């Protein structure tokens, strides 16, 4: 099963699945008007935290303690360039994030201590990759417009309720014949 996890209420989609209200879709929207108010760094960071917390809880529930880095897409922008980009938006690049960026091109697998930083940097569009559990229990990736995907057999219902109570939406996607039905490792 592939789960799409987003901040977007599925009841506000049209028949083709497009989200109808205009909203922010990237950290680059910080400072732009969203429904009459400028998106501030604090609101962005709160949403980013909800995404990373949800994903970490899912991986814990699935007993995933490592993820292989697959399909890493360059370019990975330099820490100096990102620091300037983030500063313009009222964000910063932490020492842990800068360290991860220096190492990402050479990393084949990440462990729990790197999960949060890796997810934050992908949400901030610093790089893209698919992350796959070596045991085949899950795969994770981020899409355009602040979409997050988890492929796994099942996210426990209680955890789905907890994530939804935290302001995110978990939608099961049925994709017959997808790569998920093959070997995801």
Give the label of every model feature segment.
Residues 1-147, 151-185:
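Structured alpha/beta or helical-core interaction and ligand-binding surfaces enriched in interleaved
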């Amino acid at each position: 099963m592939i789960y799409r996890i987003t901040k977007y209420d599925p009841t506000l989609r049209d028949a083709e699945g497009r989200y109808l209200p205009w909203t922010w879709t990237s950290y680059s929207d910080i400072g732009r008007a969203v429904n009459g108010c400028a998106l501030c760094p604090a609101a962005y960071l709160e949403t980013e935290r909800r995404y990373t917390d949800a994903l970490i809880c899912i991986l814990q529930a699935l007993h995933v303690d490592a993820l292989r880095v697959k399909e890493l897409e360059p370019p990975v922008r330099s820490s100096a360039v990102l620091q300037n980009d983030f500063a313009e938006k009222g964000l910063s690049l932490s020492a842990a994030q800068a360290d991860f960026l220096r190492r990402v091109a050479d990393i084949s697998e990440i462990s729990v201590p790197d999960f949060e930083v890796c997810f934050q940097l992908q949400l901030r569009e610093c790089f893209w990759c698919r992350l796959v559990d070596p045991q085949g229990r899950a795969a994770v990736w981020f899409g355009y417009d602040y979409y997050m995907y988890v492929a796994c057999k099942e996210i426990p219902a209680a955890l789905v309720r907890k994530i939804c109570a935290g302001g995110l939406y978990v939608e099961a996607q049925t994709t017959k014949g997808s790569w998920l039905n093959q070997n995801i490792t």
